[in-house]
Amino acid sequence: MNRVVVGLQWGDEGKGKVVTYLSRYHDIVARFSGGANAGHTVNYGDFKVIHHLLPSADFTKNRGIAIGSGVLLDPQVLTEELRELKEKFPDYSGEIFISESAHVVLPVHKEMDRIIDEVLKIGTTKRGIGPACADRVMRVNVRVAELGNEEKLRYFLEKNLSLKKIYGVDFDAEKMMGDLSTFYETIKDFVVSPVQLKRILEEKSVLFEGTQGVLLDLDVGTYPYVTSMNCSSSGVSAGMGFPVEVDEVLGVFKAYTTRVGEGPFPTELTGEEGEKLRKAGHEYGSTTGRPRRCGWLDLPLLRYAIEISGVDSLVMTKADVLNGFEKIKVCVRYSDGRDLVSLRDLEKKEPVYEVFDGWKSLEDKNFERFVDFIERETGRPVRYISTGEKLEDIVEV
């Protein structure tokens, strides 16, 4: 059985913990998009692990991991995560696969990201994702496949860096050659072609791990305040590099809403209310450390994300954060009364709220009513509920 896990908001929904928990039911966890701009935190009890590139498998159970063609690899980050994997999980014996078609984020991409965001004010993570994607489309970027071939690596680096000089950005190609060659030595035993990866995964039960959230998807998110890649389930096959059969799509959402960076946010709470929610949920980015914008759950946006990503079942996270709130609001529609089929004018939307009595614990009837309401409004069952920070704090409904 193959399943996909996607975020249904603007990322940070808790997908990492959910994927790690669900990986016990699968042979392998595969990343199909994103880069080091993603941050997945998993609390194993005695220690926490934050992954930006490695798939969020349960390494205590030796689940395999695969990185597809659509993932952008930051050499420094991946090297550190592989080192940490050996250090924190010394008995790990799972298989590791990296597609040779995956592209590499270069130091020049991070500098370009910084320069571009000063002008566009998108609020990126400055991890070089956008510029790397642009170079990929322009066919001047370095892939994993080029790292083991000095002649090809030099060719692509020189082409790439010559274009950057237009922007006044200059990097040492020879130093970059050396760094990338060292990186290749670290990963070369894991590198496979897309055909090889396809054959391997066809024999496995695979959990495909999405990054960010549907509302940050390049094509169907809150453009231009989006990431540079596909975050919905439609990106799985393209991101892996071959057609993928999927049996179930699981959509993860918080019991409230958060967002990092710029862009429309109809239910955003400012002032004391927003700060209270931020502190209760420890809402600070795992990649940037920036405080997240916080607001109430937005059902029109949730329904939009569910439909556009073909979600079958739901996973609710951080419901425990709302423990002790006297009243809890949920946006049930917008004041214009229209069905949300486009995010084009989202910044003009005014939320209409339904107010729920709060709960002191997730055993309260009030919480049960809250979950029932969401299931009715979305037409999807809530299959799992995250009840705390630790990996095992998940209830199968």
Curated annotation (Swiss-Prot):
Mg(2+) binds at D12, G39. InterPro entries: Adenylosuccin_syn_GTP-bd, Adenylosuccinate_synth_dom1, Adenylosuccinate_synth_dom2, Adenylosuccinate_synth_dom3, Adenylosuccinate_synthetase, P-loop_NTPase, SRP54_GTPase_dom. It is found in: Cytoplasm. Its EC number is 6.3.4.4. Substrate binds at S286, T287, T288, G289, R290, P291, R292. One of its GO terms (cellular component) is cytoplasm. Pathway: Purine metabolism; AMP biosynthesis via de novo pathway; AMP from IMP: step 1/2. The keyword Acetylation does not apply. Its cofactor is Mg(2+). Pfam families: Adenylsucc_synt (PF00709). SMART domains: Adenylsucc_synt (SM00788). SUPFAM superfamilies: P-loop containing nucleoside triphosphate hydrolases. One of its GO terms (molecular function) is adenylosuccinate synthase activity. It is an enzyme of class 6 (ligase). Keywords: Cytoplasm, GTP-binding, Ligase, Magnesium, Metal-binding, Nucleotide-binding, Purine biosynthesis. It catalyses: IMP + L-aspartate + GTP = N(6)-(1,2-dicarboxyethyl)-AMP + GDP + phosphate + 2 H(+). Binds 1 Mg(2+) ion per subunit. IMP binds at D12, E13, G14, K15, N37, A38, G39, H40, T125, R139, Q212, T227, R290. GO terms for biological process: 'de novo' AMP biosynthetic process; IMP metabolic process; SRP-dependent cotranslational protein targeting to membrane. The active site is at D12 (proton acceptor), H40 (proton donor). GTP binds at residues 11-17, 39-41, 292, 318-320, 386-388. Homodimer. Plays an important role in the de novo pathway of purine nucleotide biosynthesis. Catalyzes the first committed step in the biosynthesis of AMP from IMP. Belongs to the adenylosuccinate synthetase family. This is Adenylosuccinate synthetase. It comes from Thermotoga maritima (strain ATCC 43589 / DSM 3109 / JCM 10099 / NBRC 100826 / MSB8). The gene is purA.
